[in-house]
A protein has these predicted regions:
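Glycine-rich cofactor/substrate-binding loops
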Residues: 1-36, 97-98, 265, 280-449
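Short, well-ordered beta-strand elements within core beta-sheets of diverse protein domains
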Residues: 42-50, 166, 236-244, 369-376
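Generic, well-ordered alpha-helical scaffold segments in large soluble proteins
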Residues: 40, 61, 65-68, 90, ...
Length: 449
């Protein structure tokens, strides 16, 4: 069955090629397609295009299909093109002529669009929860490590004193910017395209505001052409937000690979979280961080993959956009898995103490010494040259306790004043900005009408 069936058989080779992986991927859209159909038929009854009797049999049937799909028992049968055709077929089998009415005033184009929006909205919500978990873990470890000094680097050269608190806190704050991008992506997904039909609207007296409220959307994609043009654009926006999270995770993983090596020795993974070598018995490799890095890099390439599918397409819908699903749908599980394993690894890694007692890192305190002399009246440039000469001839020494060192750094965002609570407040405000409660209530109301 095809929604566009005109009574003649399509060439088998053409059908295989054009359907591609759609049947497999469309299973992820099943619950969302059913929700969209429930909202659509409810609206059709409201505007007089469907009788109350028809609606009274359609909604219970759709609710049962929803339960089946939610339980993972929904199947797209052999010969059925996609999830949309399967839902209509099952309704028609069960309800007869009534099932054939659900597509009134709707195109497969806006049906796909609303499915994608609902799917994306739900997936971003899951990812946001996992970003929050990693954020809180990083902040917790940052607090635990705020008195554990380590060298900071520029150009991979020892630069100034840092701390585990400052290092891990940096990645926590990076996640607040990533969350801001996720919020923007969520807001783009939270706009209703239903009613735009094939991109030019419908002569049926549709009530698009009603379906917007029924599905918990914040607003409409108003212009019918733009609703179709937004296909690919939304996915690219989401992919960019996800690639930003992936970049943060990937950089953290690279740091951990480096800091775990014998040449640094700042952190240590439990033996149970490392792998070995078939020839070198001493090896305890941080494969978990290496694979996090590789997976993150792959996600970072995704926005370009999507852009290259949609670039220079003229106005209107084109089948090219079907290919976006193949790279877009796996994205969510890929990043979610990375977030979970990164959180687990950060929770369990050991932070080493007394790193800065190594004479190798003494020059990290040179700026502090320059500032001390400048505060005592030596012109800054002269103090700089004095300390530089002492480092060159090997006479530079700096002695201070951890507490004394931290006390010299009082400004916001320094090792002595991490501002973790202020960073947490930023994250909390971003999380609160998403109207999840209203969305959940709308979907619950729709399922229980």
């Amino acid at each position: 069955m095809k929604l566009w069936d005109k009574g003649y058989k399509i060439d088998d080779a053409i059908e295989r090629f054009t359907v591609g992986k759609d049947k497999e991927l469309d299973l992820l859209l099943a619950t969302h397609d059913i929700l969209g159909t429930m909202a659509h038929v409810t609206m059709l009854e409201h505007v007089g295009l469907l009788s109350k009797d028809d609606l009274d049999v359609l909604l219970p049937a759709l609710r049962e299909l929803y339960k089946e799909a939610e339980a993972g028992n929904f199947v797209i049968e052999e010969g059925i093109e996609d999830v949309h055709s399967q839902v209509e077929l099952m309704l028609t089998r069960q309800l007869g002529e009534v099932g054939k009415k659900v597509h009134t005033g709707r195109s497969r184009n806006d049906q796909v669009l609303v499915d994608l929006k609902l799917f994306t909205r739900a997936e971003i919500e899951k990812t946001m929860g996992l970003v929050e978990q990693l954020f809180h873990t990083l902040q917790k470890r940052s607090e635990e490590g705020k008195s554990l000094l380590m060298p900071g680097y520029t150009h991979l050269q020892v630069a100034m004193p840092s701390s585990f608190g400052l290092w891990l806190g940096a990645y926590a704050e990076a996640l607040t910017d990533d969350m801001r991008l996720l919020v923007a992506a969520f807001e783009q997904a939270n706009l209703n395209p239903l009613g735009s039909a094939a991109g030019y609207g419908s002569s049926a007296p549709l009530n698009r505001e009603m379906t917007t409220k029924l599905l918990g959307f914040a607003d409409l994609d108003y212009n019918a052409i733009y609703a179709q043009m937004n296909r690919g654009r939304m996915e690219r926006t989401v992919a960019f937000a996800y690639s930003s999270v992936a970049e943060t995770i990937g950089r953290l993983a690279m740091d951990c690979c480096m800091f775990n090596s014998q040449n640094f020795g700042f952190i240590k993974l439990p033996d149970t979280m490392t792998t070995g070598s078939s020839i070198m018995p001493h090896k305890k490799n941080p494969d978990v961080f290496e694979l996090i890095r590789a997976h993150a890099n792959r996600i970072c390439a995704l926005p370009d993959s999507i852009r290259h599918i949609t670039t220079n397409l003229p106005v209107g819908y084109f089948r090219d956009m079907q290919l976006i699903k193949e790279v877009y749908f796996p994205l969510f599980d890929q990043l979610n898995n990375l977030l979970e394993i990164t959180t687990y690894a950060v929770e369990n890694m050991e932070m080493k103490a007394d790193i800065m007692s190594n004479p190798l890192y003494a020059p990290a305190f040179s700026v502090e010494e320059v500032n001390r002399r400048a505060a005592n009246g030596v012109p800054f440039r002269d103090a700089y040259r004095q300390v530089a000469d002492e480092i060159t001839n090997g006479t530079f020494h700096h002695e201070a306790t951890v507490e004394e060192t931290l006390s010299h750094y009082t400004h916001e965002g320094s090792i002595g004043n991490l501002c973790n609570q202020q960073i947490k407040a930023k994250m909390d405000a971003l999380v609160r900005s998403i109207p999840l409660e209203g969305i959940h209530q709308a979907i619950n109301n729709l399922l229980n009408r």
